Design a protein with these regions (language model features):
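Class I S-adenosyl-L-methionine-dependent methyltransferase catalytic core
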Residues: 1-281
């Protein structure tokens, strides 16, 4: 089923947690002169028009990126993140997907491997990534991202940051995420794997972090950002999470310095809060 379109949700609270984490991870990777690969299993369109019909229909960005842009004082890393977004977006009414953020952060020597199965989003992704220079840096494939990831491991430079963020419209996505991580770690155990997931009332969502901890019990970071109390009918996403296997050593401290303020800014009611836990060797 390919019904999910991120254009309806671009720039929302979940994007803030996901993209801020991705920003911190890639900035860390850039500290070393050695090249790396960025692999995105569910890339989406790359860029989104916040003035378009999809974004305006739901207006989720108004409780996400719009609130961060309006904030007076932000912690250092969060302020740098928001400033970087303003620099890399071609127009004021646009918001980036993970691939566009990554192309701005990766260097000429790094490689990007992007997967998107949805035919319409794939065309948009292709067109948007044509703007990237040098062109040889980016490869876009209309293919299953789970299979595509495994086919690329281990990457030639033996350094990689991987983002896995399926829509989780179907229960099988939860199982596939767990399985692809098991397979990926067998082929490339030192990669940095970032998994985004929605915080929902459904059992699969609530159990996913514990399932991921079983895969990497000694080297992970787990962060959640809840923006409101779960609805009594159990409907809808009240937050989202990032689970990072082999996280940069600085990431826990950076998130600890920024998540309290991010949670405060994006709070929709008194039930807003964040979760942060990590375990490293």
């Amino acid at each position: 089923m390919l019904s999910y379109r991120h254009a309806f949700h671009a720039g929302n609270h979940a994007d803030m947690l996901k993209h801020f984490t991705l920003f911190l991870v890639l900035e860390y990777f850039n500290r070393k002169d050695k090249p790396y690969w960025y692999i995105d299993t569910h890339s989406g369109a790359g860029l989104y028009d916040l003035s378009g019909d999809e974004a305006q229909k739901v207006g989720e960005y108004k409780q996400g990126i719009a609130l961060l842009e309006q904030a007076d004082k932000l912690p250092a890393e969060l302020a740098e993140f928001v400033g970087r977004l303003k620099q890399i977006l071609p127009r004021d009414n646009l918001y980036c997907g993970s691939p566009w953020l990554a192309q701005a952060l990766t260097r000429d020597s790094d490689k990007m491997r992007l997967f998107e199965l949805h035919p319409a989003d794939f065309v948009h992704l292709q067109n948007n990534m044509r703007e990237v220079r040098p062109a040889r840096k980016v490869q876009v494939s209309q293919a299953d991202g789970y299979q595509g990831l495994i086919s690329l491991l281990p990457p030639p430079p033996r350094r990689a940051a991987v983002l896995i963020d399926p829509p989780y419209e179907e229960k099988q996505d939860y199982r596939r995420v767990v399985q692809v991580l098991k397979d990926a770690l067998k082929r490339f155990e030192t990669g940095c794997y970032m998994v985004w997931y929605p915080c929902l009332s459904r059992e699969e969502s609530r159990k996913l972090p514990d399932e991921l901890k079983k895969i990497a019990p000694d080297n992970y970071l787990h962060a959640e950002l809840h923006v409101h109390t779960p609805h009594s009918d159990g409907f809808g996403m009240h937050g989202s999470g990032m689970f990072v296997i082999n996280p940069p050593y600085m990431l826990a401290e950076q998130l600890q310095n920024n998540l309290p303020e991010l949670s405060k800014i994006l709070a929709q009611d008194a039930g807003a809060h964040y979760v942060l836990e990590s375990k490293t060797k």
